[in-house]
Amino acid sequence: MLNKLSRLLDEAGISLTDHQKNQLVAYVGLLDKWNKAYNLTSVRDPNEMLVRHILDSIIVAPYLQGSRFIDVGTGPGLPGIPLAIVCPESHFTLLDSLGKRVRFLRQVQHELKLDNVTPVQSRVEAFPAEPPFDGVISRAFASLNDMVSWCHHLPAANGHFYALKGLAQKEEMESLPEGYDIVEVIELHVPRLEGERHLVVIKPKSS
């Protein structure tokens, strides 16, 4: 699996240390193991996880600004865990409301010795952002409107929302509530992943 990951990283033009590669492979191993009992992801094949979970997460790393991020609705740690591995100088709060997912995240944190993640069990609207975050990341929300509505209290004044989407639909972007601007829509190229992938970057107008 390490060889396959290395080939995928080469295709994506991503350079990582051997330690980071080993951590990513170990994460996939833990996800595969826990998934059998806890149903953390619909992706069952570890090789498919490399593309749909690992590569699809870390491909956004170059576009993140700041050092404190929160991954809302992280599930089994996506994209937060892979991003924490490839961005060791940044800190990632991993927020999810389900206890089984947060237990898994704490096990990953322990086994991979990740000191730059904080798993938290909470609903997003009940989570106090003190201090607020440089970036709010998610691939869990059905719409951009939902994301900024539920997470409005999380970013700093100059912070950003980073929404990982399939299609970047014009109607969805035009329906953002007042007070938010689309900064950029980035087309992502994930090797061996079918379908379109986009990163939509949003900021509060106050910034």
UniProtKB/Swiss-Prot annotation:
Keyword Hydrolase on entry: no
Disulphide bridges: none
Top-level taxon in the UniProt lineage: Bacteria
GO cellular component: a single term: cytosol
Major location category of this protein: cytoplasm
UniProt binding sites for S-adenosyl-L-methionine: 73, 78, 124-125, 139
Reactions catalysed: guanosine(527) in 16S rRNA + S-adenosyl-L-methionine = N(7)-methylguanosine(527) in 16S rRNA + S-adenosyl-L-homocysteine
InterPro entries: rRNA_ssu_MeTfrase_G, SAM-dependent_MTases_sf
One matching Pfam family: GidB
Family: Belongs to the methyltransferase superfamily. RNA methyltransferase RsmG family.
Protein role: Specifically methylates the N7 position of guanine in position 527 of 16S rRNA.
Name under which the protein is recorded: Ribosomal RNA small subunit methyltransferase G
Organism of origin: Klebsiella pneumoniae subsp. pneumoniae (strain ATCC 700721 / MGH 78578)
Organismal lineage: Bacteria, Pseudomonadati, Pseudomonadota, Gammaproteobacteria, Enterobacterales
